[in-house]
């Protein structure tokens, strides 16, 4: 294939498909992390292309916290049914027994127990040696320096000072017993690339990405959508209707919406062309402390 004859989106697509096929061929028990967002939707689409007309040779894994938006759960179940994928859902039983929730315990503890520990439990339970993730280098500074093949020790920890060179699309997947890797096929994509590809390929996405009037409360400079009756209103807070959408999706009490008029994919793309802020400005977990994402990844976060 002559890469010079491809558009930049087709080059990114080809690179991602190559990575997905490499991992499927090289590792004994891979899995694709499925968090239901736009990046997961693109990654799943690429994986289906990589093995078409066959089925995916690995399952999807959703590490569930119990606090995703209702529309995300509906979209997940619809997608799995439509494509005939094998879906594994894991929720940290210890966290459930402790009653961990983001309102009472805060974003850091909730993320550590329900996401990081939940992910490590699932990887250990099924013995996965490679896990695909939809992270991109343009999202956050610690992800910017992470390799496509991100090696983890037997405790699932990442050491940014111990990464392997990746030259000319050659990847060294040699691991010792108990070790594993996280694989990021979308590393070189940008947020704009993702939206342009979704539009080009007509990929279905969670409706929360499109602007519409929604019930929100303003808290700590963020617009939190009231998704169910578990909302813990603080003194003086009032639920109001605002036309908002989400640039990134996570647990609804920890994910801020943005005011927007973008009701269609072309409108989102136009909005991205003039945006000067990071999509992760709406993630409360990134505000826990300086370097919080790198710390979480060192502890086993994806």
Swiss-Prot record:
GO terms for biological process: hydrogen sulfide biosynthetic process; sulfate assimilation. Pfam families: PAPS_reduct. It is an enzyme of class 2 (transferase). Pathway: Sulfur metabolism; hydrogen sulfide biosynthesis; sulfite from sulfate: step 1/3. It catalyses: sulfate + ATP + H(+) = adenosine 5'-phosphosulfate + diphosphate. GO terms for molecular function: ATP binding; sulfate adenylyltransferase (ATP) activity. InterPro entries: PAPS_reduct_dom (IPR002500), Rossmann-like_a/b/a_fold (IPR014729), SO4_adenylTrfase_ssu (IPR011784), Sulfate_adenylyltrnsfr_sub2 (IPR050128). Heterodimer composed of CysD, the smaller subunit, and CysN. This is Sulfate adenylyltransferase subunit 2. It comes from Yersinia pestis.
């Amino acid at each position: 294939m002559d890469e010079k004859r491809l558009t930049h989106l087709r080059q990114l697509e080809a690179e991602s498909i190559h990575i997905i096929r490499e991992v499927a061929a090289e590792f004994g028990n891979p899995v694709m992390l499925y968090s239901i967002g736009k990046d997961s939707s693109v990654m799943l689409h690429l994986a289906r292309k990589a093995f078409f007309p066959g089925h995916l040779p690995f399952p999807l894994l959703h590490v569930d916290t119990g606090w995703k938006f209702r529309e995300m759960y509906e979209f997940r179940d619809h997608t799995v049914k439509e494509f005939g994928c094998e879906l594994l859902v894991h929720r940290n039983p210890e966290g459930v027994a402790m009653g961990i929730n983001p309102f009472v315990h805060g974003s850091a503890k909730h993320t550590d127990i329900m996401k990081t520990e939940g992910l490590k439990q699932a990887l250990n339970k099924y013995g996965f040696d490679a896990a695909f993730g939809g992270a991109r280098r343009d999202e956050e500074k610690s992800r910017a320096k992470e390799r496509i093949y991100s090696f983890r020790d037997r405790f699932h920890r990442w050491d940014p000072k111990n990464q392997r060179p990746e030259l000319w699309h050659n990847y060294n997947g040699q691991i010792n017993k108990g070790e594993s890797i996280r694989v990021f096929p979308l590393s070189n994509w940008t947020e704009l690339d993702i939206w342009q590809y979704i539009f080009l390929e007509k990929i279905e996405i969670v409706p929360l990405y499109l602007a519409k009037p929604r019930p929100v409360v303003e808290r700590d400079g963020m617009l939190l959508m009231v998704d169910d009756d578990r909302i813990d209103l603080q003194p003086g807070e009032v639920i109001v209707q605002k036309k908002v959408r989400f640039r990134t999706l996570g647990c609804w009490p920890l994910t801020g919406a943005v005011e927007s008029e973008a009701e269609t994919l072309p409108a989102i793309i136009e909005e991205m062309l003039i945006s000067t802020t990071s999509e992760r400005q709406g993630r409360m977990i990134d505000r826990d402390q300086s370097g919080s994402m790198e710390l979480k990844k060192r502890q086993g976060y994806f």
